[in-house]
Amino acid sequence: MGELPFLSPEGARGPHINRGSLSSLEQGSVTGTEARHSLGVLHVSYSVSNRVGPWWNIKSCQQKWDRQILKDVSLYIESGQIMCILGSSGSGKTTLLDAISGRLRRTGTLEGEVFVNGCELRRDQFQDCFSYVLQSDVFLSSLTVRETLRYTAMLALCRSSADFYNKKVEAVMTELSLSHVADQMIGSYNFGGISSGERRRVSIAAQLLQDPKVMMLDEPTTGLDCMTANQIVLLLAELARRDRIVIVTIHQPRSELFQHFDKIAILTYGELVFCGTPEEMLGFFNNCGYPCPEHSNPFDFYMDLTSVDTQSREREIETYKRVQMLECAFKESDIYHKILENIERARYLKTLPTVPFKTKDPPGMFGKLGVLLRRVTRNLMRNKQAVIMRLVQNLIMGLFLIFYLLRVQNNTLKGAVQDRVGLLYQLVGATPYTGMLNAVNLFPMLRAVSDQESQDGLYHKWQMLLAYVLHVLPFSVIATVIFSSVCYWTLGLYPEVARFGYFSAALLAPHLIGEFLTLVLLGIVQNPNIVNSIVALLSISGLLIGSGFIRNIQEMPIPLKILGYFTFQKYCCEILVVNEFYGLNFTCGGSNTSMLNHPMCAITQGVQFIEKTCPGATSRFTANFLILYGFIPALVILGIVIFKVRDYLISR
């Protein structure tokens, strides 16, 4: 086979690329050099049980089949080296990274051991030892690069001065060539920001803040153009040279990247087909009778060679046999035995350094909550459209009511009672929706960020929830006061300042309850559209059962009457009815006494309507307020519990 241009002396990086065949453990015994950090993965296997049929097919749903995702994978890599894990979609690349980093869910069966500097790690130590950059870059879009990294540093590192955080962030940005975009916003699909390659660098920078010795990156070049992908790999290779272990998975690598990797591993259906240096890879496949053609991309050639072609049954059998032959050949090769020897030698070598845990001395619970609150507030305050809509969406609804009703009357023949009942019904029914719309629009991105950062150990998911709750409280109060101030006096409701205060307080509660109920459901259901539908259904049902406006509560079936006590609409409606109707006197047809016998003239005082619609509500006015506002902390506590459970389920 002719010499490949990227393995010639001019194209290679000198001794850096050739050191994989002789580990530093062996070098140390010869030259006496200081041993470096090492990562060993020994006989790792992972399988899950899947149901045969869909959940609605009871017979087939009860049957299960075991799926082997990883099978007897062993790797060895040292600091100063970068390893590339190749494989087609579904080959187990991401699962292998999850297994090494301790992020695999416990729903499957994991076997094997992971060693760092010869020490087997416990599950609770994985998070403190490895940094993991996911394939998707999830950030708060309205923060700048500098702010994003600074808040991450404040969450991850010990409490210190602002100068300490600034120096740390500036050093990392300089190392990753981000200084020129430090004050640019991250951006999103709604508005421009930094480029995809720069976003990927920010993801890497966020992990580097804790000085990790082992970094893993899942598909870091996916979605990037050729030049940017090459720059990212060069950057990672440079990071590896600075006494780090770097492992990346790549789906479709370019030939130019071949020379930058110290070790290359190839996975097929969860089995290791090869793991070694680029030179060892060329020699291994050449000895197996599959030399790489001159001027071909070794990545493409050997990925095609180790993939199973499922286009036809004959091709599938043929290619599967070839892959099995290559797997057996690798397990019998000196390269594989050298991997096992290095892992075993590291376990008993006493000169290796201790396990290199990340620099991690984070602030306490309330310190993290304060950082999250400041970060959430700064991010959401820059979203001008969201801020404006939060403040005026209730007011917009109120303006429609004003244009429709103009001003409520005291004449029962002109709809004095009916107009007030319709107004209160709309107010109690609409205010939870505005809260729900806010949460559905703003919280899913915060949830995505917290899902990722909580896996990095920066904080717990419920702390992000509580930070959002504290952030929305003042906005909700201001929005409700603006809405109430315009609607209450313009519509001509009971002209008393104290009544206006009760009115505003009564409408604030369902607005908050609607938003917090949405947050609770967002902790259970991933799709915001489904949450939207659930909240709408619950709000309509609660209003029908609890308000007493559609059907007299006393005439309801006992189960519905009992169910009404668990709806916040019952207490809110009783408060608003008493607040508006108590002490109110109605006229009927003016001075025309012939109209006094009209059925609509039966109600001449507001107290009559109160006793007819919600008997005893006047005496329960204070209790109703306490119960209504009791829903708010109850939902917050329920949300914290659910997000704690979510934290556990994602990490298990």
UniProtKB/Swiss-Prot annotation:
Positions contributing to ATP binding: G87, S88, S89, G90, S91, G92, K93, T94
Enzyme Commission number, as recorded: 7.6.2.-
Topology relative to the membrane: Multi-pass membrane protein
Activity regulation info: Cholesterol transport is inhibited by vanadate and by beryllium fluoride.
UniProt name for this protein: ATP-binding cassette sub-family G member 5
Catalytic activity: cholesterol(in) + ATP + H2O = cholesterol(out) + ADP + phosphate + H(+); sitosterol(in) + ATP + H2O = sitosterol(out) + ADP + phosphate + H(+)
Recorded consequence of changing K93M: Disrupts sterol transport activity. Decreases expression of both ABCG5 and ABCG8
Induction: Up-regulated in liver and small intestine by cholesterol feeding. Up-regulated via the oxysterols receptor LXR/retinoic X receptor (LXR/RXR) pathway. Endotoxin (LPS) significantly decreased mRNA levels in the liver but not in the small intestine.
Enzyme's top EC category: translocase
GO molecular function: ABC-type transporter activity; ATP binding; ATP hydrolysis activity; cholesterol transfer activity; metal ion binding; protein heterodimerization activity
Classification via Gene3D superfamilies: P-loop containing nucleotide triphosphate hydrolases (3.40.50.300)
Organism: Mus musculus
Effect upon mutating E219D: Decreases expression of both ABCG5 and ABCG8. Disrupts sterol transport activity
Gene Ontology biological-process entries: cholesterol efflux; cholesterol homeostasis; intestinal cholesterol absorption; negative regulation of intestinal cholesterol absorption; negative regulation of intestinal phytosterol absorption; response to ionizing radiation; response to muscle activity; response to nutrient
Known partners and oligomeric status: Heterodimer with ABCG8.
Purpose of the protein: ABCG5 and ABCG8 form an obligate heterodimer that mediates Mg(2+)- and ATP-dependent sterol transport across the cell membrane. Plays an essential role in the selective transport of dietary plant sterols and cholesterol in and out of the enterocytes and in the selective sterol excretion by the liver into bile. Required for normal sterol homeostasis. The heterodimer with ABCG8 has ATPase activity.
Result after altering N592Q: Loss of one N-glycosylation site. Abolishes N-glycosylation
Tissue distribution of the protein: Detected in liver and jejunum. Detected on enterocyte villi (at protein level). Expressed in jejunum, ileum and, at lower level, in the liver.
Protein family: Belongs to the ABC transporter superfamily. ABCG family. Eye pigment precursor importer (TC 3.A.1.204) subfamily.
Disordered: annotated segments: 1-25
Residue stretches making up the ABC transporter domain: 39-294
Pfam families for the chain: ABC2_membrane, ABC2_membrane_7, ABC_tran
Lipidation (S-palmitoyl cysteine): C61
CDD domains in alphabetical order: ABCG_White
Family annotation (SUPFAM superfamilies): P-loop containing nucleoside triphosphate hydrolases
